[in-house]
From Swiss-Prot:
GO terms for biological process: translation. The keyword Nucleotide-binding does not apply. Residues 45-76 are annotated as: Disordered. It comes from Clostridium novyi (strain NT). Part of the 50S ribosomal subunit. InterPro entries: Ribosomal_uL4, Ribosomal_uL4-like, Ribosomal_uL4_dom_sf. The lineage of its organism: Bacteria, Bacillati, Bacillota, Clostridia, Eubacteriales. This is Large ribosomal subunit protein uL4.
């Protein structure tokens, strides 16, 4: 069972915390991680790109000049792709990029992502994270104490005070524990999470 240090908001060690082996010490499945991240990014795409083909642009019904005898290259329409204002060849059209991932695969990916953070010493567990009022300065001090440049800060539930304290810090993101996803975990260099949020993760994934 992996054991990690437990810190306060000042970055001082205040104890140890044992993590569930079935969540934070599994075999990292990079293939599944890749598939889930690709699916998440695909699902974020709007898919509303669109351009007109030569059949859709206006005009061009008349042949611009006769076929032979002008000395110029033959042309059939001023809306052919080689003309200015002509239609687009293989024009992109709105489409749905959504990909579905089985629940079992999402669970494997989440456990693999969490384990990778433990293996790479990028997991920081806080005893608690509470502020009386929004204080960006306090959050900057905490992030610097753990040498984080792009931290993902995970709290037990939505917290407006913490959110306002972090929103102006470049690279930092705050999410409630029930909104974490594999892509966010992997793209941030530090995974800062409260002890209570760890317990909630273990309840779901253990």
């Amino acid at each position: 069972m992996p054991t990690v240090d437990l810190y306060n908001i000042e970055g001082q060690k205040v104890g140890d915390l044992q993590l569930a082996e079935t969540v934070f010490a599994v075999e990292v499945n990079e293939d599944v991680l890749h598939q889930v991240v690709v699916a998440q990014l695909a699902n974020k795409r709007q898919g509303n790109q669109s351009a007109k083909t030569r059949a859709e642009v206006s005009g061009g019904g008349k042949k611009p000049w006769r076929q032979k005898g002008t000395g110029r290259a033959r042309q059939g329409s001023i809306r052919a792709p080689q003309w200015i204002h002509g239609g687009v060849v293989f024009a992109p059209k709105p489409r749905d990029y959504k990909m579905s991932i089985p629940k079992s695969m999402r669970r494997v990916a989440m456990k693999s992502a969490l384990t990778s953070k433990v293996n790479e010493n990028e997991l920081v567990v806080l005893e608690s994270l509470e502020l009386d009022a929004p204080k960006t300065k306090e959050m900057v001090k905490m992030i610097n104490a753990f040498e984080g440049k792009k931290p993902l800060i995970v709290v037990p539930e939505s917290n407006e005070v913490i959110y306002k304290s972090v929103r102006n810090i470049e690279g930092a993101t705050v999410v409630p524990v029930n909104n974490i996803n594999v892509y966010d975990i992997l793209k941030h260099d530090k995974f800062i999470i409260t002890k209570e949020a760890v317990s909630k993760i273990e309840e779901v994934y253990a």
